[in-house]
Amino acid sequence: MAPKKKWSKGKVKDKAQHATVFDKSIIDRINKEVPAFKFISVSVLVDRMKINGSLARIAIRDLAERGVIQKVDQHSKQAIYTRVPAATA
């Protein structure tokens, strides 16, 4: 009989040190980089911009109101946006 396999320790993820308030540099990065993303959602902004979820939702809402990005689909919790095509912008 084979020896009993030991349980792995599992992966330990470090606590995220994401920004919790907007400052000028974050706003500038969002306005410059996010409209170029093909797929835009709260989780994408949290991952790439290193901001927390509430800031990501505020940023997406602001970009959508200004017409920089457009909504593709809305799930019960997750909204998916994309960049505005160049022909309509």
UniProtKB/Swiss-Prot annotation:
Keywords: Cytoplasm, Ribonucleoprotein, Ribosomal protein. InterPro entries: Ribosomal_eS25. Pfam families: Ribosomal_S25. One of its GO terms (biological process) is cytoplasmic translation. Transmembrane segments: none annotated. Disulfide bonds: none annotated. GO terms for cellular component: cytosol; cytosolic small ribosomal subunit. It is found in: Cytoplasm. Component of the small ribosomal subunit (SSU). Mature yeast ribosomes consist of a small (40S) and a large (60S) subunit. The 40S small subunit contains 1 molecule of ribosomal RNA (18S rRNA) and at least 33 different proteins. The large 60S subunit contains 3 rRNA molecules (25S, 5.8S and 5S rRNA) and at least 46 different proteins. Component of the ribosome, a large ribonucleoprotein complex responsible for the synthesis of proteins in the cell. The small ribosomal subunit (SSU) binds messenger RNAs (mRNAs) and translates the encoded message by selecting cognate aminoacyl-transfer RNA (tRNA) molecules. The large subunit (LSU) contains the ribosomal catalytic site termed the peptidyl transferase center (PTC), which catalyzes the formation of peptide bonds, thereby polymerizing the amino acids delivered by tRNAs into a polypeptide chain. This is Small ribosomal subunit protein eS25A.
